[in-house]
Each structure stands twice: as structure tokens, then as C-alpha cells.
Design a protein with these regions (language model features):
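N-terminal auxiliary segments of SAM/dcSAM-dependent transferases
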Residues: 2-60
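Class I SAM-dependent methyltransferase Rossmann-like catalytic core
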Residues: 64-81
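Conserved class I S-adenosyl-L-methionine
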Residues: 95-105
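Conserved SAM-binding loop of SAM-dependent methyltransferases across substrates and taxa
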Residues: 106-118
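Conserved SAM-binding loop
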Residues: 135-136
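Conserved SAM-binding strand-loop segment of SAM-dependent methyltransferases
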Residues: 141-153
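A short acidic, Gly/Pro-enriched loop at the edge of an enzyme's catalytic core
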Residues: 152-162
Length: 162
């Protein structure tokens, strides 16, 4: 891995589990984009996420205000019990190294779980660009790999996640 990459880029250098959502070829990090051999390119946004579904229009049900409100509720601890159960499952799953959060919303669970399990690699997807922006902006250590993606057709290679 190129150690000269900025931290928010470096975490995507090992994102070998992903396939181009257009042609299903392997994606590799080239400068500040994930690219395939067929020249499809997906840029790293300034907030630290990659949009692998640029053709998808965001639903009005998934607006920024909705996710900001949800983030406040989650941060207030109303769903702490769920977080603790999932964290315990990860603690008991020693062989699970690569974790996929599908429908990550504003990133509460991925962010908190990564803080508790820094030895694991977290990939988090949501179809809402607004929610992924909130997630990426609220993470300071660039440890979670954030993606906008079509949850019905995730661009992930078979058997690449635990």
C-alpha cells in the first residue's frame, strides 16, 4: 500500500473486494478514483466516500434532515442495546475481519463498531448520498470505507466479506 497517500485515500487502496457497478470488472485505486480496466471511474468525494451509483436519483424520503434527526436519536443512546449486541457478535467472531454494513444511513453503527473493533475493516453502503456524506463528515479518523451504492445490486465480489 502506498504510504504517501492521504489517510482518506489510503483506506481505499485495499478495497479489492469491489467490482465496477457498470461492467463488473475489478476496481483499483488510481490517484483519487476507483477505476476499472474499461475506464469507468468513480471519484473519491472531498468528504471521503465513493459514489458507486451515480446514476441513481435520490428519493425524497431520504433527505439530509431526516438523517440528521436520526443521527441525533442514535447518538442520544436510544438504540445502545442494539449496538452492544452487534459489538458482542463481532467480538465473538474472531475470524471475521471484513465487515459490510448495508443500509448504513448516517453511519452510526459502522463508526461506533469500528471504534470498538479497530482490527476489523468496515465497508458501509447506503443508497442515499446525503446520508453517506453525513457519515463521512462525522468520522475523523478515516477508518470506515463509505460508499453510495445500489443496495439491490451491490458491486461486491462473491465471498469477499465476512
Amino acid at each position: 500500500m502506498n504510504t504517501n497517500l492521504k489517510p482518506k485515500l489510503q483506506r481505499f487502496a485495499s478495497a479489492t473486494a469491489f467490482a465496477c457497478p457498470i461492467c463488473q470488472e475489478n476496481l483499483t485505486l488510481v490517484e483519487s478514483s476507483l477505476k476499472c480496466n474499461n475506464r469507468h471511474s468513480f471519484d473519491l468525494a472531498k468528504f471521503g466516500y465513493v459514489n458507486l451509483a451515480p446514476q441513481i436519483k435520490q428519493s425524497a424520503n431520504y433527505d439530509k434532515e431526516n438523517f440528521q434527526n436520526r443521527q441525533q436519536i442514535l447518538e442520544a443512546g436510544f438504540y445502545q442495546a442494539i449496538l452492544e449486541v452487534v459489538s458482542d457478535l463481532l467480538s465473538n467472531s474472531k475470524n471475521a475481519k471484513t465487515i459490510l454494513d448495508i443500509g448504513c444511513g448516517e453511519g452510526f453503527y459502522s463508526r461506533k463498531l469500528q471504534e470498538s473493533h479497530p482490527e476489523k475493516t468496515f465497508y458501509a453502503f447506503d443508497i442515499s448520498k446525503d446520508s453517506v456524506q453525513i457519515a463521512a463528515k462525522s468520522e475523523s479518523n478515516w477508518a470506515v470505507n463509505w460508499f453510495v451504492g445500489d443496495l439491490a445490486r451491490l458491486p461486491i465480489k462473491d465471498a469477499s466479506m465476512d
